[in-house]
UniProtKB/Swiss-Prot annotation:
Function: Catalyzes the attachment of serine to tRNA(Ser). Is also able to aminoacylate tRNA(Sec) with serine, to form the misacylated tRNA L-seryl-tRNA(Sec), which will be further converted into selenocysteinyl-tRNA(Sec).
Pathway membership, UniProt: Aminoacyl-tRNA biosynthesis; selenocysteinyl-tRNA(Sec) biosynthesis; L-seryl-tRNA(Sec) from L-serine and tRNA(Sec): step 1/1
Gene3D superfamilies registered for this protein in UniProt: Bira Bifunctional Protein, Domain 2 (3.30.930.10), Serine-tRNA synthetase, tRNA binding domain (1.10.287.40)
Top-level taxon: Bacteria
One example of a Gene Ontology biological process annotation: seryl-tRNA aminoacylation
A matching Pfam family: tRNA-synt_2b
NCBIfam families registered for this protein in UniProt: serS
Alphabetical keyword list: Aminoacyl-tRNA synthetase, ATP-binding, Cytoplasm, Ligase, Nucleotide-binding, Protein biosynthesis
InterPro entries attached to this UniProt entry: aa-tRNA-synt_IIb, aa-tRNA-synth_II, aa-tRNA-synth_II/BPL/LPL, Ser-tRNA-ligase_type_1, Ser-tRNA-synth_1_N, SerRS_1_N_sf, SerRS_core, tRNA-bd_arm
Organism the protein comes from: Haemophilus influenzae (strain 86-028NP)
Descriptive protein name: Serine--tRNA ligase
Amino acid sequence: MIDPNLLRNNLAEVAEKLKVKRNFMLDTEKLTALEDQRKNLQVTTENLQAERNARSKAIGAAKVRGEDIAPLLAEMDDMGNQLTEAKAQLDAVLAEINQIALSIPNLPADEVPLGKDDTENKEILRWGTPHTFDFEVKDHITLGEEANGLDFAAGAKLAGARFAVMKGQIAKMHRALAQFMLDLHTEQHGYLETYVPYLVNHATLYGTGQLPKFGEDLFHTLALEGEQPYALIPTAEVPVTNLVRDVIIDEAELPIKMTAHTPCFRSEAGSYGRDTRGLIRMHQFDKVEMVQIVDPDKSMEALEELTGHAEKVLQLLNLPYRKVLLCTGDMGFGSCKTYDLEVWLPAQNTYREISSCSNMWDFQARRMQARCKAKGDKKTRLVHTLNGSGLAVGRTLVAVLENYQNADGSITVPEELRPYMGGLDVIGK
């Protein structure tokens, strides 16, 4: 949620930025009208409350003097009804303003390039040289099926399209990748490993910005009688970031760096017909997520660090990749600046996204009321939150299978993974 003071004091400027940079049309007339109502109702409520307090004192004094207070009590009842009505109207207006505010995307940082979609993203760097092969390259689907390790037919039987079953050495490599990533982030990058619920309540989803705008992208449970509704997490960012919801953090404890390996669940609404085969776009996939809660003056520096941590995974696995700065038209709803890391996939002869690292500024913190305070200070500040994939495990598996394939259909195990796979150096044929 963007700063409500910006909406009150710089509405026209904010609306223009949202239009140009986010292609978002803010209804300024409606917001202005609601803000006028809010001010009037606020004044009315405060005046009625002050008058009610004064009348209450007058009744007490009249009672001491032995006067008939029945008429005064009747007036108090009437004033109480007026106050209740005014408060209800004020609450309704505030709720309507809040709903509009929840629908507004974050404002991009000044250095984010203007653009309509991913074709206008800015490439920052390339690392590694794409592998060349002297044989016909196979895609990960063929490699996985030939190794008897990927079974998409079984996934479809059990659950439907965009599900897969992994077995044997492929399943072991999938697990090894997640363990390798967690060990790297906890032992070398200073993250605290966390285990979090895979089902979360709606307050948690509002906190990180999935609700109310992106409800259709989630898998929701049917609430039993007396139970609250839940949704399956689309990313560990949701529960991990919300660990600081409604918390005032000592600034000396910042930054807080957390990582978690979880399954992620996405409906992929709007992705019909895209990546229908293979592991690239699944309803259920694993990801190792990195989250940082930082001093609001240091979040851009933290974004560079966090992105570097994701890059380190690719570098240690010797997987060629490129780093791109997303343009305004390709950024996520809550982000003010995002880097994507795209790994080279030989079978597709292109780079594909494997990590997205974002600085959310104070957008999520304002929704969550996550704040920090220096020792001795009375005033609190909103923290800044960042998140990034470190990495998407399934897509990393795809990259390893395709980049490390051999002419006979076997796959060489990257050196970094061998300790996690019992010393195996080759899998498959």
